């Protein structure tokens, strides 16, 4: 994490927004008129938001984040644009409510930058890092009632195996789940180090030497479960498209295959004619709602990855709304 020399935010809280130039390039055509509204649904530390409001001088930005600390830091970073920025401390699945409360019927652009922010990764107290010995928390929103420790110590072996297999794509899910249940019968598992070492011991020795840290997939799975990451994304993508005005644009940055596949499936379905097979003519309400702006998922350049290794897993997809989904049949 390095500081932007042009920013007034302390270096410790400044991050490098991923693929920021491409994000701005894709959003800007929708933001060229006074009063255009762009939603940064995951404002985080404000890096993308700052670049967008700087480039789109007539636009207003609404930034959402479920982490109150992130909102405070983003407010610092965006202080110079305070007259054009509203920050709201809610998760992005409250998008419809946020717009309704402000009397906004449609927006020009929406950005989602999914996954962990630098703020979460770099704060050991959050319990996301398997390389540290800290409480097993993993909540992006500290107000959530359930921690990773709660999941590990209360889910059945079957439930744990499902979480690890589905959200972590962990091939040793059953072995790890059984090991967790045996260990917690003696003593609750409460720290990241305890869980990390347990996972390492549970999987076969040859597998420990390949594919990165042995606990990587387990930690990913627990994080997704605790924060309902995929559920929120699946619920919110249709809401986001409904909120876009025709000609509006949506950009999504994802960081693991489960997120990217969810976005890919949704975009492809919305960009396809949904007329049932066998009908003699296409249904007007089944016409494509989106036009894809990216050919597949775009990746960061080698230069960006070299400067910011955390960008390496990023996948970017974008689309433009071409039909008002609220039109009459």
Swiss-Prot record:
It catalyses: cytidine(1402) in 16S rRNA + S-adenosyl-L-methionine = N(4)-methylcytidine(1402) in 16S rRNA + S-adenosyl-L-homocysteine + H(+). It is found in: Cytoplasm. Residues 295-329 are annotated as: Disordered. S-adenosyl-L-methionine binds at residues 46-48, 65, 92, 113, 120. InterPro entries: RsmH, SAM-dep_MeTrfase_MraW_recog, SAM-dependent_MTases_sf. Its main location: cytoplasm. Specifically methylates the N4 position of cytidine in position 1402 (C1402) of 16S rRNA. This is Ribosomal RNA small subunit methyltransferase H. It comes from Acidothermus cellulolyticus (strain ATCC 43068 / DSM 8971 / 11B). The gene is rsmH.
